[in-house]
Amino acid sequence: MTQVLKFGIPKGSLQDATIALFKRCGWKINVNGRSYFPDINDPDISCALLRAQEMARNVEHGTLDAGLTGKDWIAENNSDVHVVADLVYSKASARPARWVIAVAKDSPIQKLEDLEGKTVSTELVNYTKRFFQEKKISVNVEFSWGATEAKVVSGLADAIVEITETESTIRAHSLRIIHEMMQTHTQLIANHDAWKDPFKKAKLEQIALLLKGALLGEKLVGLKMNVPHAGLDAIVNLLPSLNAPTVAPLYQSDWFAVETVVDSETVRDLIPELMAKGAQGIIEYPLNKVI
């Protein structure tokens, strides 16, 4: 019997970013209308769309072999799963998000202990309850169905526990962060039995390798340039690289071709410096994956 890896794709805010990431790895996932079972161009994988909040529970219980979800939702469900890989990406950025405790700007609440006996609104109910229990602070934790930031403004809660990447929504609602509760990022997780299966483990290792390579590729760019012999040492010394830059002599010339990989955020400052040192014909190109 042909084996298939039952794989969960997070539905909602992470869905588009996940599908785009898989595409860069060579897997095309096609979501057909309202179907919860997308097509994928790999006969070894069967996909299912599932909310990130439910993913860990379904992987733990074996409904799915593996899936992608946030570290926060694994903690919320207290799920016993195998973490195959940490993958730092989200709908908005390539950095971890944070669950924070926030109150109104003009609130007298300044520290965690000031929340004793108060009402806290959040979607992350179970983790929040455990957090305050460990701190020995008695609070009333209420589940929020959405628009959590407005709960403080409307007087329905004294504080909220909410996820943020840029803090822009927090600031827009005139809220003030009093504590960072946890950092979270996407994780590739597997059911323990699936991880023991040689076929499924090998497939998951392949997925993890390529996803991590694609994420690293997003942060880096390649640079090629022609460099005169007289300026070669000075230019090579300017260049960061995964290892060392590749240097090759040009045919019947006193020039060299130099190629390297650099951080995409530093290249804007690096290119003028390279030109000042004599580099010519500089080409910057994107990297699909860096393994």
Curated annotation (Swiss-Prot):
GO CC annotation: cytoplasm
Domain of life of the organism encoding this protein: Bacteria
Pathway recorded for this protein: Amino-acid biosynthesis; L-histidine biosynthesis; L-histidine from 5-phospho-alpha-D-ribose 1-diphosphate: step 1/9
Compartments where found: Cytoplasm
Description of how activity is regulated: Feedback inhibited by histidine.
Cofactor(s) required, per the database record: Mg(2+)
CDD domains: PBP2_HisGL3
EC primary class: transferase
One biological process term in Gene Ontology: L-histidine biosynthetic process
Keywords from the UniProt entry: Amino-acid biosynthesis, ATP-binding, Cytoplasm, Glycosyltransferase, Histidine biosynthesis, Magnesium, Metal-binding, Nucleotide-binding, Transferase
EC identifiers of the protein: 2.4.2.17
Coiled coil start-end: none
Disulfide bond listed as a keyword: no
Catalytic activity: 1-(5-phospho-beta-D-ribosyl)-ATP + diphosphate = 5-phospho-alpha-D-ribose 1-diphosphate + ATP
Keyword Protein biosynthesis included in the entry's annotation: no
Gene Ontology molecular function: ATP binding; ATP phosphoribosyltransferase activity; magnesium ion binding
Main location: cytoplasm
The family this protein is said to belong to: Belongs to the ATP phosphoribosyltransferase family. Long subfamily.
Function, as annotated: Catalyzes the condensation of ATP and 5-phosphoribose 1-diphosphate to form N'-(5'-phosphoribosyl)-ATP (PR-ATP). Has a crucial role in the pathway because the rate of histidine biosynthesis seems to be controlled primarily by regulation of HisG enzymatic activity.
Xref: PANTHER family: ATP PHOSPHORIBOSYLTRANSFERASE (PTHR21403:SF10), ATP PHOSPHORIBOSYLTRANSFERASE ATP-PRTASE (PTHR21403)
Name of the protein in question: ATP phosphoribosyltransferase
Gene field: hisG
